[in-house]
Swiss-Prot record:
Its EC number is 3.6.5.2. This is Transforming protein RhoA. Changing Y34A: Abolishes interaction with DGKQ. It is linked to Ectodermal dysplasia with facial dysmorphism and acral, ocular, and brain anomalies: A neuroectodermal syndrome characterized by linear hypopigmentation, alopecia, apparently asymptomatic leukoencephalopathy, and facial, ocular, dental and acral anomalies. Patients show no intellectual or neurologic impairment. Pfam families: Ras.
Amino acid sequence: MAAIRKKLVIVGDGACGKTCLLIVFSKDQFPEVYVPTVFENYVADIEVDGKQVELALWDTAGQEDYDRLRPLSYPDTDVILMCFSIDSPDSLENIPEKWTPEVKHFCPNVPIILVGNKKDLRNDEHTRRELAKMKQEPVKPEEGRDMANRIGAFGYMECSAKTKDGVREVFEMATRAALQARRGKKKSGCLVL
């Protein structure tokens, strides 16, 4: 039986952990050096609820320089992973400010999973000290859940690509969301206008 194919696009601020999350899930290795993404694709097979799914993983660049290029990733998307970093409250702030409007414009009706990356840094002393200097603290789980409700996300997950904690669960939830997505008579995927 042929696998069902679904397209997943990951978005979020630059350096919030998008590429690491995809690489750990698809290749099971954590990249130690940071290289800003322009456009990368990976494919991974996943089984959920007895269904074999081939996930096409589309990585995107979060940097503003790529705001005009990123929409090329959106057509025919089945599910969006919208990421922020738990060690960066500013990246959470950009979820409603930047990422939700962009995604809802290009991908109306496509389910969104809100993902808090770098969960391992929430209790990291160095991270807490650095944030305290700016009168900030790591994002709390309830702040992530509240944001997911606010933007109408399908769900909220937290993970650490570094420790692999929660990584598989993120993609299981995303796959379920992609499989459940209601398709109207017309294909209701993303549009580029």
